[in-house]
Amino acid sequence: MEGIIIKGIGGFYYIKTDEGIIECKARGKFRYNSLKPMVGDRVTIKVENGKGVIEDIHERSSELIRPTVANVTQAFVVFAIKNPDINLDLLNRFLTLCEYNDIHAVVCLNKEDLCTEEEKENLKELINDIGYEVLFINAKEGKGFDALKERLEHNITVLCGPSGAGKSTLLNSFIDREHMETGSVSEKIGRGKHTTRHSELIDVDNGYLVDTPGFTTLDVTFIDRDSLKYCFPEFNDYNNLCKFNGCNHYKEPKCAVKEAVEEGKINKLRYEFYIKTLEEIINRRGN
C-alpha cells in the first residue's frame, strides 16, 4: 500500500492512503541507513495485525531541512506590502532558497488595501522582471483566496515569509474551510487551532499545504559559489554569453550579466544582493 506522510511525531507517522489515515512506525533499516522519514515523503507501507510499518521511502524531488519537509513543489512567499514594509533583502533570501531547492515560488503581497494602484503596479513590475508571479491578497478579508486555491492542485505548497506578514491568517482560512469538510481527519491526527510545533500536510483542493513552525534559518551561504548564479532566474539568458566559461559575474571581465545590469536589463538591487551573498559565501569558506 502506498501513501504520503502528512504528520510525524514521537516516532509515529501518519500516512494518508486510499484507505484512510494509517498510523505507522518506520523500519529500523532507515535508521541504519541514516534515512529518516519526513513529512511529504511518498512511502510504501505494510499493515499487519492492525499495525502499520513504513517499508520503503520513495525518491524525493526536494528536501527542506528547516522546516523538515520533502517533495515541496511550490512556495507562497508571503510579505506584507506595508506594516511592516517589504524587506527586499529578506524576500531575496526566500527566493534564493526556493530556486536552490527547485521550488516554484509565487510572491503573495498581503495587506494590498494599504497601497495605491500605482504602488502595486511598480511592485508587480519589479517582481515580474526578476521572473516571479505576484498575487495581491488581503488575508483577513479573503481577497485573492481563490487565486491561491487554483495554484494548490497537484502541489505540495509551503507558506513562508517574515513574522507579521499574514501567513497564520492565510493558513487558518484554509484550515477553517477544510475542517468543516474533513473534521474527522483533523481529529485523527490531533490538529487543533493553532500552535505549530511540527510540520504537517493539510489536504486542500487536490493538493497539500504545509503547516510548519517556519523557516528557522535563512542562511544561504551553504550554497556553492559556482551554483549561486543559477538561483537568479534573470541571469539565465546571460550565463552562457560571458567571455569566460564558469563566469560568476563578479570580478571577471567581459561579463554579460554585468553588462545587462549596466544597460538596465537586470535589476541593479538584485545584482547587488547577488554580489553580497557571493562575498558572504567566499568569506565563509575562504575560497
Swiss-Prot record:
Entry EC no(s): 3.6.1.-
GO biological process assignments: ribosomal small subunit biogenesis
Binding residue positions for GTP: 110-113, 161-169
Residue ranges annotated for the CP-type G domain, each copy included: 61-218
One Pfam family this sequence matches: RsgA_N
Highest taxon, organism lineage: Bacteria
Entry GO CC: cytoplasm
UniProt cross-references to InterPro entries, sorted A to Z: G_CP_dom, NA-bd_OB-fold, P-loop_NTPase, Ribosome_biogen_GTPase_RsgA, RsgA_GTPase_dom, RsgA_N
Protein name: Small ribosomal subunit biogenesis GTPase RsgA
Origin species: Clostridium perfringens (strain 13 / Type A)
